[in-house]
């Protein structure tokens, strides 16, 4: 989450005329994240999250995201629910941007997830995949393997400003992934961005999964690979196989991996590392002046990629085969 677009009091009041939420009590921008403009909105009826969708989110995909949230919530997943307007719609416009209001979930993120937290995350991800299995909507992954060279091309000449030799590293990894990307794995709705800052905890239990604005149809095991990179490395960069084993074990207890999925995890993890390294690199060079946002260091994910390049067997990552 972040704030790229400011909202005036007058614009907000006019926008809220479409809802039955009462008068505004407070609006506070959220600096975390990098994609959309997000605010904690307090009104006479409660606390909500207001999101203005920025350029990386396709406006045509917004009905998919909001319908998915309704679907998952109806199946018992703790996720935000879109707040309906008086017209029964969930999507409007504010400050020149598409905008929506969703329910606020109580809880805090784990900055340093424990092994037990990784197990809970694995179970929650499996529950998400199973709950979404009968969702009728579909959306292609706009940041899949085919998109990565296009992300890289406009910034390739600047990559070595971040680290010497980075451009060559990226080019070589793209060639490897294009030649070795697994095919014909089980597919379905994935979250595609399930970092620790998108999972809320109350005590020892997960109280909510948030920020579904990269959700799409892709390999289910690719979602696991994204989580592996986001949850199972220590702050200093070392991989924690116990966290990996806890996550994979809890996931597989609800949705067992096929042999092909398990074998593919190392390559999928390399792809996931490159995907987030590239989008962070793009954002590093393109922070709008005055935006309330904290761009994330792309080198964190290049370091993870470097480690993953040494893995020859999924069991080295904690996958149970």
Curated annotation (Swiss-Prot):
Keywords: Amino-acid biosynthesis, ATP-binding, Kinase, Nucleotide-binding, Threonine biosynthesis, Transferase. It is an enzyme of class 2 (transferase). It comes from the Bacteria. It catalyses: L-homoserine + ATP = O-phospho-L-homoserine + ADP + H(+). InterPro entries: Aminoglycoside_PTrfase, Homoserine_kinase_II, Kinase-like_dom_sf, Pseudomonas-type_ThrB. One of its GO terms (molecular function) is homoserine kinase activity. One of its GO terms (biological process) is threonine biosynthetic process. Its EC number is 2.7.1.39. Pathway: Amino-acid biosynthesis; L-threonine biosynthesis; L-threonine from L-aspartate: step 4/5. Belongs to the pseudomonas-type ThrB family. This is Homoserine kinase. It comes from Methylocella silvestris (strain DSM 15510 / CIP 108128 / LMG 27833 / NCIMB 13906 / BL2). The gene is thrB.
